[in-house]
């Protein structure tokens, strides 16, 4: 799955001063940042802010109306999206990397998962297989499904096929949101995802 590591910085420097910050890297790409101060530990960071893919949650009507939400995270990373969870929310996360899966739950490194305000279930497996099992089990559909598995060097194309997209929509509520994070240093995924949107008449 490539080299992963956590970099510790202090207020944006390495001089040991300021606020301690942990940054999660996979290769040369930073996939998660946490401010290691209690009053700031649940602050969404990086591309998970309300101005990034976090808007799929933050901008949802149920979030604004303080109603319970069900959120599925495909590509757990360090679980930054759990920062949005509230007491009655349910979050489900998938990841295929044993190292990433373990690190996300190590509260010495990151606490988004361990200190999550809502209920969190995590699975170390291929997300598509896990979702197929959820569908077979008749789970309650989700309000938001966020696919964040395409930012690395190796693209899991089976998570972007028509069959995969069909699966996501089967597991979404009628007013649900499907968010696909397409940032990638090597490939331009926008045309492909745009075609999917047109095919499904998504606005």
Regions found by a protein language model. Give the residues of each.
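Conserved beta-strand signature within the Rossmann-like core of class I S-adenosyl-L-methionine
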Residues: 175-182
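Receiver (REC) domain switch-region micro-motif
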Residues: 71, 145, 178
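Glycine/threonine-rich flexible loop motifs
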Residues: 152-160
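Short SAM/SAH-binding signature in class I
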Residues: 140-148
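Conserved S-adenosyl-L-methionine
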Residues: 202-203
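A short glycine-rich, Lys/Arg-flanked "PGG" loop and its adjoining helix->strand segment in the class I
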Residues: 160-174
């Amino acid at each position: 799955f490539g080299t992963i590591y956590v970099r510790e910085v202090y207020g944006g420097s390495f001089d040991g001063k300021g606020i301690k910050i942990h940054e999660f890297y996979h290769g040369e790409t930073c996939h998660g940042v946490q401010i290691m101060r209690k009053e700031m530990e649940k602050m969404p960071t990086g591309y998970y802010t309300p101005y990034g893919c976090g808007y799929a949650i933050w901008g949802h009507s149920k979030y604004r109306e303080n109603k319970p939400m069900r959120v599925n995270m495909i590509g757990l990373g360090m679980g930054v999206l759990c920062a949005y969870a509230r007491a009655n929310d349910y979050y489900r996360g998938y990841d295929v990397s044993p190292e990433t899966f373990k690190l996300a739950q190590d509260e010495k490194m990151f606490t988004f998962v361990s200190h999550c305000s809502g209920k969190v279930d995590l699975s170390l497996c291929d997300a598509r297989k896990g979702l197929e099992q959820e569908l077979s089990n008749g789970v309650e559909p989700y309000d938001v499904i966020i696919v964040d598995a395409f930012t690395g060097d190796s693209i899991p194309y089976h998570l972007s096929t028509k069959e995969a997209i069909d699966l996501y929509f089967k597991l979404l509520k009628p007013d649900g949101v499907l968010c696909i994070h397409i940032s990638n240093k090597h490939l331009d995924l926008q045309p492909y995802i745009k075609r999917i949107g047109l095919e499904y008449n998504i606005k």
